[in-house]
Amino acid sequence: FGSVAPGGYAWVFPKESVSNIGLGVQRKMSKGRSLESYANEFIERYEGEESFRGAGYLPMSGTIGQFVKGNYVLVGDSAGMVLPSNGAGITIAMIGGRIAGQVISEHINNGVDLQEYQSRWEAQMGEVMRNSKRSFTIGSLLFRFPDWFLNIAFNPFTRGFIWRAVTCRKMFWVF
């Protein structure tokens, strides 16, 4: 984990005759190296023709404090709707877009306050985002350990705990 993608993760998803290969890193754990340098090093381990190469950054700190200002609403990456624990954002943005669209329609037709968008978002996604942020924080601490330690720590006995963290559920029954 740490040597390939510090504070993040790497993936190889086979798709018929091609593969999606990539990684995510935490900038503060990257030791001054660029995302591109980590990506190049990882991708070059695999054979085959390259059809696309790109790199970008995600807002991994969770949602911003205010989605609505006046008649403007923010959705998706602009509102920080990316799960800090795993970088997932498409589904989260779609949920935000659906809620925003409903509230905007109600605002136009019935005068509903646009702030209702943030209230509904919190009601539907607030716990998921909080759990994801907690998982990210714990993961950030764990990923400071060397790879050999992580290989021991991530084992069949901890699988359930890790799965709960990655899927943004409460990792412990206490909090």
Feature locations, PLM:
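FAD/FMN-dependent oxidoreductases across multiple families
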Residues: 6, 27-104, 109
